[in-house]
Amino acid sequence: MVVAKKMHVAKKMSKEELREDKVVTAVKRLGEFGQRNIRYIAGGAALLLVLIVGVAFWSQNRTRAAEAASLGFSQAQQLYFSGNYAEALARFQAIESQHGSRGAAQPVSLFIGNCQLSLGNPTEAESAFRSALNRLSGDPILRAGAQRGLGAALADQGKMAEAAAEYQKAAEVSDNPLAADDWLAAAAAYGEAGNSESARQAYQKIVDDFPSSIHLMDAKLRLAEIAARQG
């Protein structure tokens, strides 16, 4: 009886609820992926956590043209989250080629950059993220993701001063849920570039503006180290 009741309820789910359920599933996979790769994500290099908003944006803003790419996008995501970056990249590039990367397809360009980063192709990743920034509309969260990806691509090329500037741009995006992470990445990059004052300011931003961040103690420790070096 219980099983039958559950089946009856499932049949009454609206299209909106089904779409939301797909978003929740994608978010859960994203969270599991982040937990497995947090060492890389926190460092800002090799991998970039694609924002949940981007996944939801794709799922909730479909047009008839985008419906044709929906299945391919879902399959490409599964490949990406399972670590099959080469095949995922080919799928995302095919979607971009056939459907473009504007409107609801904007997250595709971010996934392409992420795949290139994960495959150890920082130059190609830089190109992908710069292209994404040129095409993105006014969505600030997607722009923050592209700036963060560009910072990671530059850092992987050893261009630490440029990387720091891009991380800072991402951190300064209004309502960026990963702002503290971006300030931490910016501070580390500034430090590696030899700009201790900018590094200090970035760490201080975490202390001042994000007192509940998991990076708070790390920021305080780095500030103490900088102060000790400066005598």
Regions found by a protein language model. Give the residues of each.
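TPR-repeat structural position
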Residues: 85-86, 122, 160, 196
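Short solvent-exposed coil/turn linkers within tandem alpha-helical repeat scaffolds
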Residues: 96-105, 134-143, 171-179, 207-218
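N-terminal positive-inside, membrane-proximal cytosolic segments immediately preceding the first
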Residues: 2-44
